[in-house]
Amino acid sequence: MYIVFEGIDGAGKSTQINLLKDWLDQNGFDVETVVEPTDSEVGKLIRKILQRPDATTDRIQKTLGLLFAADRMLIMDKLNDDSKVILSDRSFISSLAYQEPAEWIEQINKYAKEPDLVLLLDVDVKTSVNRCSKEDEFENEEFLSKVKANYLDLISNFNHEIIDASTGVNKVSTDIKKAVAPYMGICPDCIR
């Protein structure tokens, strides 16, 4: 099972992935987590480029698009391991939400694995910006408003659940467990 957490920066993806991993581990599942960008050499290069002041320019965005697609290809074996539950902090869907043009992003990611379930953590842009570290050029209201709109437009193309990520860590975690439970053969009504 390949479950992807998506959402704008500051939505709480990392926190919620860890909480879901712990819960699934406790329920006897073999769980592995991945983060995009990865810790590969390509992923490290992506992280470095994201810090550049010109990271939002068209040229750098296209470069990042290619690098993210390459980084994804490096983890395909892990994503295709059906013996594990894979929880991913982002996927090619992030590239579709964050980068342009969409047709080109789709083309360079045509071999990316499609998630079995996408959990879109939805949070207000102002809340997101307040939660962010302000480490890169993308953590601003104008840009994140556009990205959020992109997510909401494209999410219907995937098997998904939209989770209100503004309700507090515990409530969000419970909502995620209830969304994931049926896929894992767990009674969602038994989750509190």
UniProtKB/Swiss-Prot annotation:
PROSITE patterns, alphabetically?
THYMIDYLATE_KINASE (PS01331)
Q: Which domain of life is it from?
A: Archaea
> What EC number(s) does the entry state?
2.7.4.9
Q: Which InterPro entries match?
A: P-loop_NTPase, Thymidylate_kin-like_dom, Thymidylate_kin_CS, Thymidylate_kinase
- A GO molecular-function term, please? dTMP kinase activity
Keywords in alphabetical order: ATP-binding, Kinase, Nucleotide biosynthesis, Nucleotide-binding, Transferase
Q: Which GO terms describe its cellular component?
A: cytoplasm
If you read the UniProt record, what top EC class would you report for this enzyme, in one word? transferase
Which biological process terms from the Gene Ontology are attached to this UniProt entry? dTDP biosynthetic process; dTTP biosynthetic process; dUDP biosynthetic process
Quote the record's binding site residues for ATP: G7, I8, D9, G10, A11, G12, K13, S14
Q: Which reaction does it catalyse?
A: dTMP + ATP = dTDP + ADP
Q: Which PANTHER family match?
A: THYMIDYLATE KINASE (PTHR10344), UMP-CMP KINASE 2, MITOCHONDRIAL (PTHR10344:SF4)
- Protein family (similarity comment): Belongs to the thymidylate kinase family.
State the protein's name. Probable thymidylate kinase
What is the organism field in this record? Methanobrevibacter smithii (strain ATCC 35061 / DSM 861 / OCM 144 / PS)
Q: What is the lineage of its organism?
A: Archaea, Methanobacteriati, Methanobacteriota, Methanomada group, Methanobacteria
